[in-house]
């Protein structure tokens, strides 16, 4: 009852050549330092919540901002916690708890970022696209090489094909439903 909730809107943004990326504020939201200062302004204990904590790209970006603003993190709660994520929280000094613990997870995939026309990671552009469109990339073949290091060529091809087929099936189901309604 005596709590405040505030979402931190982050986005993984690739450079135009896809060589590197950074964690930034989601388009049309306040810059990350401002979002963290907003949380600090409530002067309440902070509990960070996410669906999964593995390599901690986002929390690595947020940790220095939380420290700069003297925003204490009382707890990190996640659905899935991996051994790598647990070790990172230990390094940062954040208490962490998860519903499921996956100590030896080597790779993870976020399906929504792999499906063309459904999701993806943002690609930096100097000009904005019309209609609120976001330039994005799906890290699958043929758009870009998958960024998963221990994956051989055949496995990358099979993963890419699976993502393309799933995206097609989802879009066909949506089209069928739309045509049935209209």
Roles of regions detected by a PLM:
Residues 1-46, 56-61:
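Short, glycine/charge-rich flexible loops or terminal/linker lids adjacent to PRPP-binding catalytic cores
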Residues 2-14, 64-182:
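PRPP-dependent phosphoribosyltransferase catalytic core
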Residues 50-52:
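Active-site metal-binding loops of divalent metal-dependent hydrolases
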């Amino acid at each position: 009852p005596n709590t405040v909730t505030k979402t931190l809107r982050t986005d993984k943004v690739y450079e135009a050549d896809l060589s590197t990326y950074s964690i930034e504020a989601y388009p049309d939201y306040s810059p990350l330092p401002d979002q963290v200062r907003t949380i600090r302004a409530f002067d309440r204990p902070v509990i960070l919540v996410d669906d999964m904590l593995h390599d901690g790209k986002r929390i690595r970006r947020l940790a220095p901002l939380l420290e700069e603003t003297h925003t204490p993190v009382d707890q990190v709660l996640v659905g899935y916690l991996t051994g790598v994520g647990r070790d990172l929280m230990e390094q940062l000094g954040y208490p962490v708890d998860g519903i499921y613990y996956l100590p030896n997870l080597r790779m993870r995939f976020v399906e929504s970022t792999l499906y063309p026309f459904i999701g993806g990671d943002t690609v930096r552009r100097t000009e904005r696209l019309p209609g609120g469109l976001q330039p994005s990339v799906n890290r699958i073949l043929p758009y870009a090489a998958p960024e998963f290091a221990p994956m051989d060529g055949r496995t990358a091809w099979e993963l890419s094909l699976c993502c393309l087929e799933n995206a097609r099936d989802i879009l066909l189901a949506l089209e069928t439903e739309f045509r049935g309604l209209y």
